[in-house]
């Protein structure tokens, strides 16, 4: 996930500053149990052949590439607002021989028709957005998903204990207190329900060195 550079939506780059973007993969891999929680997110999504899958705020492409490698017959698209990370993602996909389309667009104005995708997945993105931008983004995801399709999100959530809450303070210093407070207050479930999703729930949590990582899911009725 990365910065939406030309949007009225205002949020923070992946590691707080653009110059840190080249180090994103290494930092996430070392500190956040990336493979563990992303593989859990992929399993949670129950992907099937020929499904259209969107990785929202795909960043450097890791999740989208793993999805394609795990389900080669799926049609996988990644979208991000930062052309720099889109370029990195394309190079990574090419090196991995993974056929993934990467588009540059804003999360609250996605360039896809209504009822187009079977799954939307997203990792470590929503905590970068203001509440207003979270709402606009959730509405967009509801629009582009088919009836009966599903949303699966991995992001910071309500801390499971005081230690996890204390560790999350460092994320708030880096990414902003206003943007991240919705996550640590447990408001993502409310966000997705207000957008129209049904059966919204937190499915799993993971302890990391920076706090509690939560996996969410929701379904578009129909």
Each language-model region and where it sits:
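Conserved class I S-adenosyl-L-methionine
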Residues: 2-46, 62-66
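A short glycine-rich, Lys/Arg-flanked "PGG" loop and its adjoining helix->strand segment in the class I
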Residues: 135-147
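Class I SAM-dependent methyltransferase SAM/SAH-binding core
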Residues: 54-56, 60-109
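C-terminal alpha-helical "lid/dimerization" subdomain adjacent to the S-adenosyl-L-methionine
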Residues: 8-11, 152-195, 200-214
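A short SAM/SAH-binding and catalytic strip from SAM-dependent methyltransferases
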Residues: 119-132
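A short acidic, Gly/Pro-enriched loop at the edge of an enzyme's catalytic core
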Residues: 108-120
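Short glycine-centered segments of the SAM/dcSAM-binding site in methyltransferase folds
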Residues: 52, 148-150
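C-terminal lobe and adjacent flexible extensions of AdoMet/dcAdoMet transferase-like proteins
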Residues: 215-222
């Amino acid at each position: 996930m990365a910065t939406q550079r030309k949007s009225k939506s205002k949020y923070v780059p992946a590691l707080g500053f653009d110059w840190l973007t080249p180090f994103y993969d290494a930092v996430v891999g070392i500190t956040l149990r990336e493979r563990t929680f992303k593989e859990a997110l992929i399993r949670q999504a129950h992907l099937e052949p020929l499904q259209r899958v969107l990785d929202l705020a795909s960043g450097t492409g890791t999740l989208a590439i793993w999805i394609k490698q795990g389900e080669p017959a799926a049609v996988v698209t990644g979208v991000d607002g930062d052309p720099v990370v889109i370029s990195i993602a394309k190079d990574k996909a090419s090196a991995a021989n993974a056929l993934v389309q990467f588009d540059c667009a804003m999360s609250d104005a996605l360039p896809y028709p209504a009822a187009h995708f079977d799954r939307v997945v997203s990792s470590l993105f929503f905590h970068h957005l203001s509440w207003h931008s979270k709402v606009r983004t959730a509405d967009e995801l509801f629009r582009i998903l088919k009836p009966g399709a599903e949303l699966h999100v991995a992001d910071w959530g309500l801390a499971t204990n005081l230690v996890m809450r204390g560790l999350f303070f460092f994320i708030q210093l880096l990414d902003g207190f206003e943007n991240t407070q919705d996550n640590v207050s447990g408001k993502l479930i409310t966000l997705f329900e207000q957008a129209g999703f049904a059966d919204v729930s937190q499915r799993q949590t993971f302890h990391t060195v920076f706090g509690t990582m939560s996996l969410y899911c929701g379904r578009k009725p129909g």
